[in-house]
Design a protein with these regions (language model features):
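Short loop/turn segments that flank or connect secondary-structure elements
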Residues: 1-153
Length: 153
């Protein structure tokens, strides 16, 4: 998937038919991979709105088909480990991609665009992360290196 000149791998789950729910929902409509679900699933039915180098959560009211939902505070709903670090990671990644996209669009240099896109794939998706080390620290180091390579302050 290419978004504004940056290649981003996507996870796409095929459902049984158009409009069908997630294939990982069990007979009771509950997530069967709950402990290992992706980040976007962890916040569902919330979404994110990015503003002023941060983001906030919004409730997507038509996406969840469950009826008679109870009210739950956002802070209780999101059960991501190391929530503060995770939110900083999400913010840093989002605004890094925006900065790269702006820089590449301004350059118009097809070779630079391709080279930068491949470096992002290599640094963040292909090069393995060490499971015995903190993910966020590893990400931060890679982000600093990639910003230097891409000429982003």
């Amino acid at each position: 998937n290419i978004v504004d000149g940056v290649i981003l791998p996507n996870l796409k789950m095929n459902t049984q038919a158009e409009g069908e729910p997630c294939v990982f929902l069990d007979a009771e409509g509950r997530c069967s991979i709950h402990e290992d679900r992706p980040g976007i699933c962890r916040i569902f039915p919330l979404g994110r709105v990015y503003e002023d180098n941060s983001f906030s959560y919004i409730l997507q009211i038509h996406e969840c088909q469950k009826e008679n939902r109870s009210k739950v505070k956002v802070s209780k709903w999101i059960d991501t480990p190391d929530l503060k670090k995770n939110q900083q990671f999400i913010t840093d990644w989002h605004y890094f991609l925006k900065a790269v996209q702006a820089r590449l669009a301004a350059s118009g240099d097809e070779e630079q665009i391709k080279r930068t896109a491949m470096q992002i794939l290599q640094y963040f998706y292909i090069e393995p992360y060490h499971t015995d080390c903190d993910f966020y620290e590893q990400f931060d180091k890679r982000l600093i290196q990639m910003k230097k390579l891409a000429g982003i302050d």
